[in-house]
Amino acid sequence: MSLSEQYEEKVRPCIDLIDSLRALGVEKDLALPAIAVIGDQSSGKSSVLEALSGVALPRGSGIVTRCPLELKMKKSRKADFWHGKIKYEDYEEEIEDPADVEQMIRKAQNEIAGTGMGISDKLISLEVTSSNVPDLTVIDLPGITRVAVKDQPENIGDQSKRLIKKFITKQETINLVVVPCNVDIATTEALKMALEVDPNGERTFGVLTKPDLVDKGSEETVVSIINNEIVYLNKGYIIVRCRGQQEIKDRVSLNETVKRERDFFEDHPHFRTLYDNRKATIPNLAEKLTLELVFHIGRCLPRLEERIQVKLSETQAELDRYGSGTPTEPEQRIYFLTDKITAFIQDVLNLTTGEEVKSMLYMNIFPDLRKQFDLWKNDLDSVGETFNKKIEKEMKAYEEKYRGRELPGFLKYNTFEVIVKGQIKQLEEPAIRRLKEISDLIKREFSQLAHSNFPGFPNILKMAKTKIDNIKQVKESETESILRTQFKMEMMIYTQDKTHHDNLKMLKSKEEGKERQKLGVAHSPSHKLYDHSDSEGIREELTCHLKSYFSIVTKRLADQVPMVIRYMMLQESAAQLQREMIQLIQDRHNIEELLKEDHDIASKRNNLHSCQKRLTEALKYLAKF
């Protein structure tokens, strides 16, 4: 059964669906299933496409394909029928004579990429409906060049490679690589580029051209390539013979070319087996490509619909951020500004309570705050550990330096005070450092909310950020003052008697436990741990008091410092920002200035509306399919 009989009913709808989505512009938002044709210069790429489409394409030296060309071929049931249509940018024109196609493409390229030799990534769409073409759509890409010629830019090679990679990198693209038989396939730039983006050759298909130019003795190498024995490609290879330069000069018809191609392979002693195995000729290539494209489309469609839904949701969310634009009526403008500022304030307040922030999904400041508060606890623990290690040494040094007329064994409260105050003082600057870090964090988060709530309104954004910055400075100064006052109070040395007694008792119990373990005794030793009559015993007693009190201080500061910082820098800053932003609404003189919109925003909003429209249409197409 022939291809047209077996697949006609499902082939064309599949290809038409993707062509329709591409015509809608969906490819601006998402990659669509496609066959991209690439090849080095003089690889025979244009000849292959001419043989498939039945129309002459631009030829010449240098890069002749200067824009991606979407070649849509539609098989007509009418005998000897031909019709063409070219579309690019906002231009569309019917083509009645196939002889006009080449000139029409050149004209389109000149209008898009200029009259020189530059290239562009803007798509030209050529539709050919004929009884002599397969149902197939391919995208022809500029040939790969290494050296600039004539008016080409010096970096034309890099430009062409970037454009090609833009297409062939997409997982939805089948890469059709055209390679001449008379070159070493392993050195061709086109195949190298294809395998860079598709290392396993899963979506790469090779076409070998110019078999009539193969050197004698090299034929079996070509056969090995086609049989996938040299450079493996999952989709395999096929070999074709198209019109040569002399045949083009002699104006040999494409129908005659197909006949000559068939005769060439049937009569060739080496390539005949390839023809018998349907691995040769343009008709077999057309059939293979159509089947590959239809299968590829069928495999991509379920995921495509899902991706369109996701993109549509993202587009709607972005449109919500930009809003519907500024109203023109004065009263409506006031309401508009009020709504924007209210939404911003609500986001700020929600941020301070850990609730959902509307303008920025998943934004939550508390994990970062907890990290900072954990660092503060680490500061406390670090100073405490250092204190415990050097406490006895410090007491001995202090006693030697400051002991007066008193006999050994008399415990001075002043010694206790001086040592404790010295340790507490070491905690003050780490607390201020945490304040600065958290202050910067809160400013960043508030500023992000301002950016997400006021896109396109630079004056409101600037005003909000100025207020955030000013409030940060004021509240940071106030909070620093409170913290320093807290540390001044800590210098008074105070806790409830019972608190100190209980803590001391617990600490002594732990120390005695350690002593028992050290002595290897199950019960308490006969002498008390601190019942010494010499200065060492006194120092041990004082050590226990110092450790006990310092642990009380660190427990107090572990909570107090974060509570002060969180209340002043987060809660109070948010409340002050709320008051000052509301004041903006009440000052009617600045409303016009505040509502001046960024000139790019209207354009972005229009682009988003266009995207939303084409994606919605795309879903309708998919639903009907």
Curated annotation (Swiss-Prot):
Residue ranges for the region (G4 motif) are 209-212
* Family annotation (Pfam families): Dynamin_M, Dynamin_N, GED
Q: Give the start-end ranges of region G3 motif.
A: 140-143
GED domain segment(s) = 539-625
Taking every annotated instance into account, which residue ranges of this chain make up the domain Dynamin-type G?
29-302
Q: Show the segment(s) annotated as G1 motif.
A: 39-46
Superkingdom classification of source: Eukaryota
Q: Name one GO cellular component term.
A: microtubule
Q: Name one GO molecular function term.
A: GTP binding
Where does the record place the region G2 motif?
Answer: 64-66
Q: Where is this region: G5 motif?
A: 241-244
Which regions form coiled coils?
none
GO terms in the biological process aspect are: defense response to virus; receptor internalization; synaptic vesicle budding from presynaptic endocytic zone membrane
Q: What induces it?
A: By interferons.
Localization, UniProt: Cytoplasm
Binding positions (GTP): 39-46, 140-144, 209-212
Task: Please give the family membership noted in the entry.
Answer: Belongs to the TRAFAC class dynamin-like GTPase superfamily. Dynamin/Fzo/YdjA family.
Q: What is this protein called?
A: Interferon-induced GTP-binding protein Mx2
